Amino acid sequence: MAEITNIRPSFDVSPVVAGLIGASVLVVCVSVTVFVWSCCHQQAEKKQKNPPYKFIHMLKGISIYPETLSNKKKIIKVRRDKDGPGREGGRRNLLVDAAEAGLLSRDKDPRGPSSGSCIDQLPIKMDYGEELRSPITSLTPGESKTTSPSSPEEDVMLGSLTFSVDYNFPKKALVVTIQEAHGLPVMDDQTQGSDPYIKMTILPDKRHRVKTRVLRKTLDPVFDETFTFYGIPYSQLQDLVLHFLVLSFDRFSRDDVIGEVMVPLAGVDPSTGKVQLTRDIIKRNIQKCISRGELQVSLSYQPVAQRMTVVVLKARHLPKMDITGLSGNPYVKVNVYYGRKRIAKKKTHVKKCTLNPIFNESFIYDIPTDLLPDISIEFLVIDFDRTTKNEVVGRLILGAHSVTASGAEHWREVCESPRKPVAKWHSLSEY
């Protein structure tokens, strides 16, 4: 019988030595774990602090300023009111939890077919701060923070903006410093203050878009933020216009527009050094001369199946959004709102290099018949860009909050003609 040879190495180590080695390894592991945890904890605390007082933004055709400073997603808890009478005697109302959201609930107008619903709080607006409300809804003095476009308060002082313009010849860069604003109006009746920030765009190309940080509860904000735009020849400065949009941050809805400042660089000569300017903030002119194009959509409702079919057919005459003048890459995003809450969102495929895209894409939504008066459908035509942020070309709203005659008529025909597809062209409005 052959002898079996054990080829495994043998280790003659004392149990005491092995125990000491194991204890040492354990101590090292615990120490490393504690060190890593402390570093992560300190880094998390630093992120929660306010941003530094002054930013230097180095841009080359794109905005690198962190959008998360003012565009964090806020979630408002929604609950059902079991005690409220609601519409038709037994329907429950959709309410915003005022205790957690910081909002005061308001009573619905018992008159009209839309009482008991919160569709008058739909977060879709004509502009940054102008909500679309149904005709039967009236505003009390404490409910609105913005002035209606038809308000007689046309001569209200909106404050002033101070900034400077400079040009770096070696780097061929335009340097704009937003310094401060004075005398801003109160946009929040509860705090008697405002949370201002500024968006700046270089017209007419709209390729350079930046914004400052939000300064809380102040009517005289000091931003002191510098933005550097590379790749702008000095010879082209005379054709450019600086557009400053002054806004107030709103955590519960779209930010409110305070006003705007338009500065043509044709009258500014930064060749000899920094030029400091102060301009009055004026009411924003929402009547834009540029056409946003048209969108054709088809809607049909099946009352038996309680199903809404939305078909995005095509668009035409879309504006060129690229500085190079090339055709865009449009797609359509469809948002469905029930009252204040968005209940569905979908989008079409991107159509490459065209200003007259044909989509022919359908989306189906299960919507009970009794909820139709509270439903609004928002269509956003968006220009896709691989290098910069996608830009909204225009918007269309159908439903109870449609502000255009064609939109209201389209929705009425859909509700009055069940099982029949109704297709119409609509002009897009500015987002």
Curated annotation (Swiss-Prot):
- For the modification Phosphoserine, the affected residues are S134
Q: Which SUPFAM superfamilies match?
A: C2 domain (Calcium/lipid-binding domain, CaLB)
Under the heading InterPro entries, the entry gives: C2_dom, C2_domain_sf, Synaptotagmin
Q: Which residues bind Ca(2+)?
A: D250, S253, D256
The stretches that face the Cytoplasmic side, renumbered to this chain, are 37-431
Query: Which cofactors are named for this entry?
Result: Ca(2+)
Which residues lie within the region annotated Disordered? 134-154
Low complexity bias located where? 140-151
What about PTM?
Ubiquitinated, at least by PRKN, and targeted to the proteasome complex for degradation. Ubiquitination is inhibited by ATP13A2.
Task: Give GO terms: molecular function aspect only.
Answer: beta-tubulin binding; calcium ion sensor activity; calcium-dependent phospholipid binding; identical protein binding; metal ion binding; SNARE binding; translation initiation factor binding; ubiquitin protein ligase binding
* A Pfam entry, by short name: C2
Topological domains (Vesicular): residue ranges?
1-15
Its predominant location is membrane
Q: Kindly indicate whether the keyword Electron transport belongs to this entry.
A: no
Q: Where is the C2 domain?
A: 157-279, 291-426
Its Gene Ontology cellular component terms are: axon; clathrin-coated vesicle membrane; dendrite; dendritic spine; dopaminergic synapse; early phagosome; excitatory synapse; exocytic vesicle
Topological type in the membrane:
Single-pass membrane protein
Q: Which UniProt keywords apply?
A: Calcium, Cell projection, Cytoplasmic vesicle, Endosome, Golgi apparatus, Lysosome, Membrane, Metal-binding, Phosphoprotein, Repeat, Synapse, Transmembrane, Transmembrane helix, Ubl conjugation
Q: How does it assemble?
A: Homodimer. Can also form heterodimers. Interacts with PRKN. Interacts (via C2 2 domain) with AGO2 and SND1; the interaction with SND1 is direct. Interacts with KIF1A; the interaction increases in presence of calcium.
This protein's domain notes:
The second C2 domain/C2B is required for the inhibitory role in both clathrin-mediated and bulk endocytosis. The transmembrane domain and the first C2 domain/C2A are critical for the inhibitory role in clathrin-mediated endocytosis or bulk endocytosis, respectively.
Role description: Synaptotagmin family member involved in vesicular and membrane trafficking which does not bind Ca(2+). Inhibits clathrin-mediated and bulk endocytosis, functions to ensure precision in vesicle retrieval. Plays an important role in dopamine transmission by regulating endocytosis and the vesicle-recycling process. Essential component of a neuronal vesicular trafficking pathway that differs from the synaptic vesicle trafficking pathway but is crucial for development and synaptic plasticity.
As for family, the record states:
Belongs to the synaptotagmin family.
Q: What PANTHER family does the entry give?
A: SYNAPTOTAGMIN (PTHR10024), SYNAPTOTAGMIN-11 (PTHR10024:SF115)
The molecule here is called Synaptotagmin-11
Q: Say which species the protein is native to.
A: Homo sapiens (Human)
Top-level taxonomy: Eukaryota, Metazoa, Chordata, Craniata, Vertebrata
Question: Corresponding gene?
Answer: SYT11
